[in-house]
């Protein structure tokens, strides 16, 4: 907690100094001094570019640019007829800091405060050195390039208030670790090919020893010590290939694998090496002159679980989501020149224990699915007002009648 408080204070001081410095020049022409850098939409972009493709604010000759976003909402939820009433949620307040250190050398960090200050995380803090467009070195705290949502998760981008179930529990976004790696892109006419490959610290034994009483990669990432040491003493590998066509869309295939358990300590062998692996496929496309957008992702998890564990802890998991969003109105509204009204729907599913019981042969349940209709108003591209209704069904391990949940949500998200 002391570390989190220290980070918060230093970040706050930096923002205050930035604002004070800009205010001290208020008597001059601030339109020349203060410059807003919008997200770059002029070039073909992949999900791997999302970390830098954000709006920033610079001031004069300061060597740093800042930005961020805020998410807040209210919701009313009811499960099997039981409700705790309305709640207001300040979900995320995120700050970005970027700097060009020298030619072809740059730095970016992302600091996120969740639920007020309940969680404070450095989600990204890395230096990039470009030797060639196909060969860039990145090191520090990096986002593991598994799936697309883990890389492209900023709230203002999405018309849905909740993050996808599979992006929280199957792939535990936002997943970051300390490490190094390479990335690059290659352009050919309308095509762009990108790759990323990193070696980082990985998960720990909490994958199979947690309060959820199931196999959970989300529980395995909660250990803050992963930023200073590897629990297994071995690196975790994450790699991704992505290809994009200007007219068709983007397809990405990614893989992550590593030993998660403490198999050796002080030279003594405690257990065999047990791995956790994830294979993910993501895609996105735009149709009808960008008025219809389809985004999706599926992921399969493989975990080596000790034979002494019961089947409550699954060796395989699967999940995914698909968002279909259409623009039904785009015009000047209340003084906003290019305001948009979108309608959409999200379909999502997660199975935390694929397989059947050894004794009975019956199917193991422990799954959840949901459908989420959405109405979103975008006065400008960086701000969204969202209204969602969420209907979900969740079954326990034995497949008993599912718990039925309905959630009404209204909120906003904006870059600043």
List the predicted regions and their residue ranges.
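Bacterial Sec-dependent N-terminal signal peptides
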Residues: 1-30
């Amino acid at each position: 907690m002391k570390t989190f408080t220290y980070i918060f204070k230093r970040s706050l001081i930096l923002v205050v100094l930035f604002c004070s410095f800009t205010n001290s020049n208020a008597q001059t022409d601030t339109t020349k001094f203060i410059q807003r850098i919008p997200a770059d939409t002029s070039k073909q972009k992949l999900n791997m570019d999302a970390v830098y493709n954000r709006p920033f604010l610079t001031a004069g000759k300061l060597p740093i640019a800042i930005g961020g976003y805020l998410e807040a909402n209210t919701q009313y939820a009811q499960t099997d007829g039981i409700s705790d009433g309305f709640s207001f949620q300040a979900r995320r307040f995120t700050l970005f800091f970027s700097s060009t250190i020298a030619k072809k050398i740059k730095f970016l960090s992302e600091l996120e405060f969740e639920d007020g200050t309940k969680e404070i995380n450095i989600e990204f803090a890395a230096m990039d050195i470009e030797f060639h467009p196909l060969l860039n070195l990145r090191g520090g705290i990096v986002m593991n390039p598994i799936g697309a949502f883990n890389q492209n998760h900023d709230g203002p981008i999405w018309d849905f208030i909740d993050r996808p179930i599979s992006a929280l529990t199957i792939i535990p976004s936002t997943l970051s670790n300390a490490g190094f790696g390479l990335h690059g892109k290659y352009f050919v006419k309308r095509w762009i090919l990108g790759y990323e490959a990193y070696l980082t610290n990985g998960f720990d034994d909490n994958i199979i020893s947690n309060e959820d009483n199931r196999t959970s990669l989300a529980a395995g990432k909660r250990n803050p010590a992963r930023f200073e040491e590897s629990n297994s003493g071995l690196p975790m590998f994450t790699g991704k290939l992505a290809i994009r066509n200007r007219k068709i869309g983007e397809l990405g295939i990614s893989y992550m694998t590593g030993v998660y358990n403490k198999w050796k300590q002080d030279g003594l062998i405690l257990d065999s090496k047990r791995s956790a692996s994830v294979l993910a496929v993501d895609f996105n496309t735009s149709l009808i002159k960008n008025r219809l957008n389809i985004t999706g992702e599926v992921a399969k998890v493989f975990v080596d679980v000790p034979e002494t564990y019961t089947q409550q802890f699954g060796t395989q998991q699967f999940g995914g989501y698909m968002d279909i969003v259409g623009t039904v109105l785009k015009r000047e509204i209340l003084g906003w020149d290019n305001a948009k009204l979108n309608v959409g729907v999200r379909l999502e599913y997660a199975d935390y224990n694929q397989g059947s019981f050894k004794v009975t042969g019956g199917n193991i349940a422990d799954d959840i699915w949901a459908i989420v209709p959405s109405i979103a108003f975008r006065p400008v591209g960086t701000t969204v007002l969202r209204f969602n209704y969420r209907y979900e069904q969740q079954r326990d391990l034995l497949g008993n009648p599912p718990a039925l949940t309905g959630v009404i949500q209204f909120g906003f998200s904006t870059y600043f």
